[in-house]
């Protein structure tokens, strides 16, 4: 398995938390500099695009940009959006790494990430059932946030009802804070490390 994506994700997590906390503590005192920050950001990744996108003909940076919503008063909502984006990316990385493991173990599983978790758990010691459950929870949470408007439904509840007591109720709104990203990362790393042990002896 290629661990670089999850290591890169961790570095991104730290960088975003660091930047947001300093901006929050400073009450976004330089928010008028947003436009110049965007122009500087345009040079962060070069080349900007490595294929012949028609969008490259579009002008960039000519229009003055400013915050439409005050970042101080909307910090909580912005933080929740950041958590959502990072959580989505973590699930994508986890899914790709599970696919790599399944191939190396000559296993087959369903298309959904939870099916891959269940299949790979067959080679993981039962001591780490907590990691399996946490990985399933991560997938369910991603589905709630991205596919059901932030509210639990019967399908997402079915993923966690075996170990979340009491289980969420249909229509109940989900909220996830930054500490959960660290907990889910620990679960993913633990689960995949245990799978890796099985791969080494297979």
Residue ranges and their predicted role:
Residues 98-140, 147-148:
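Short non-catalytic regulatory patches outside canonical folded cores
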Residues 1-88, 96, 129-141, 157-202:
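Extended intrinsically disordered or low-complexity regions, especially N/C-terminal cytosolic tails and loops
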């Amino acid at each position: 398995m290629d661990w670089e994506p999850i290591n890169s994700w961790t570095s991104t997590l730290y960088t975003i938390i660091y930047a947001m906390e300093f901006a929050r503590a400073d009450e976004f005192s330089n928010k008028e500099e947003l436009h110049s920050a965007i122009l500087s950001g345009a040079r962060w990744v070069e080349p900007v695009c490595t294929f012949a996108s028609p969008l490259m003909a579009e002008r960039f940076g000519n229009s003055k940009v400013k915050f439409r919503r005050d970042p101080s008063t909307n910090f909580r909502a912005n933080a929740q959006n950041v958590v959502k984006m990072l959580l989505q990316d973590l699930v994508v990385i986890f899914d790709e790494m599970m696919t790599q493991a399944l191939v190396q173990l000559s296993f087959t599983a369903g298309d959904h990430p939870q099916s891959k978790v269940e299949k790979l758990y067959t080679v993981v010691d039962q001591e780490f059932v907590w990691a399996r459950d946490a990985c399933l929870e991560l997938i369910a949470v991603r589905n709630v946030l991205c596919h059901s408007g932030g509210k639990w439904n019967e399908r997402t509840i079915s993923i966690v009802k075996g170990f979340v007591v009491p289980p969420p109720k249909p229509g109940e709104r989900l909220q996830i804070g930054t500490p959960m990203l660290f907990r889910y990362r620990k679960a993913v790393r633990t689960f995949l490390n245990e799978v890796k042990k099985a791969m080494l002896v297979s």
